[in-house]
Amino acid sequence: MTENTGNKDTTLLKAVKSGDIKNVSALLAYGANVDTTDNHGNTVLMLAANLGYTEIVRSLLDAGANINLFRKTYHLTALMLAASANQIDVVKLLISRGANVNAINEDGSTALMIAALKGYIEIGQILLGAGADVKITDKDNDTALKLAVKHKHPVMVKALTQNNNIVNSQDRGGETVLMMSADLGYLEIVQALISSGADVNIKNVDHQTALLAATATGNTDIITALLDAGAEINHQDQEGETALHLAVVEEYIDVVKILLQRGADVQIRNHLGDTPLLIAAFQGYSDIVAVLLAAGADMEKKNFGEVALTLAVSQGHFPTVKLLLDYGADINKLADDGKTALVKAITANYPEIFQLLLAKAANVNLQNSSGTTALMWAVAEGYSQAVEMLLQFGADVNLKNQGGYTALMIAEFNNYRGISKILREAGARE
């Protein structure tokens, strides 16, 4: 052959790409550059490795090809390219000839990370056996294990977590791969991690656990798996939230039921002082309120001076108010602001709830510490319909507050002539 070097190199590239081992051997014997590259920066070794031409790879290595050269674009090596194409025999050969299993590409990834991302379990096992470092992190702070988790490869997860202590490793935020898997809703991965010894009660920097992560997404299967593995059901994060609190906030009734069946504390308060029932009542989640009440939730517990009933009334949640009353909530309980449920219904102008409370025999003449009655509140708000209904249900028109004022005096002070007329007709005295 009388080709010049440039032509030999071009011909070598073509021969490698087509898998022509005889022509490759001949070109190498006639002096072709064993490390020649194509327009993308791939050496002939990289091309052969990626295409799975094991014997060509062997010939190139025998001819002195640089096994650990980096491609100009993305900084890839022959081993990385072979791993990315699942070329098992080539990977074995490259490793046996000294390929650097921990070489890092432009993104900080290794051959093991590539295999983990794609789920190539045999490649992963070969690399691990050759000393691949499972703790290397890329520019996205991902490890091989994290990539296997994110891309849902449970068999790879088990392989990566065997014979090392990375299953419980935490990132800068204290997150474990178990927390990540629970958050993503990957049940198989969660099960694989648990079987590999993952600690279900490790906390991140916010004191959140895998159980809280699973609860936030409402995944009942993962929640059950974590509880079966010993997750602390009443653990509180830095805000004092438990899994039950989170389930109520997200309105996951099935999760609420599971947690209660497994022993969640129905009376526990978060750091704001809220019980699960107070949250459910405030949001008007009647179905959840019913479940909590059936589990023994205390309706008379207060936070910021409010009980479940007064919270539900103040937010206008009629079904929740009715449910609480049917369960025996104290209809005349005073909130710390001196208002009963009846007064709150009046001041918030919820006539349907107001009528319900009257029908349930709310005390229309109850006076708070300042002597104010529901009638006085209705007059002060200028709600003539509420005034008439209170009178129909027996409101005492001549009661006085601590300042000596009657409902009529309040009406006249505010120049509510229509209400003054109603009160006088009901027997109000000057």
Where do the model's predicted regions map?
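Ankyrin-repeat-protein effector appendages
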Residues: 1-11, 130, 159-166, 172, ...
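Intrinsically disordered, low-complexity regulatory segments in ankyrin-centric signaling systems
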Residues: 1-30, 39-42, 62, 430
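Ankyrin repeat boundary/linker residues
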Residues: 5, 38, 71-73, 105, ...
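Start-of-repeat signature of ankyrin repeats
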Residues: 8, 41, 74-75, 108, ...
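Ankyrin repeat A-helix N-terminal signature
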Residues: 14-19, 47-53, 81-87, 114-120, ...
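Conserved ankyrin/ankyrin-like repeat signature
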Residues: 23, 55-56, 89-90, 122-123, ...
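Ankyrin repeat domain, specifically the short helix-to-loop turn at the C-terminus of the second helix
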Residues: 25-32, 58-66, 92-99, 125-132, ...
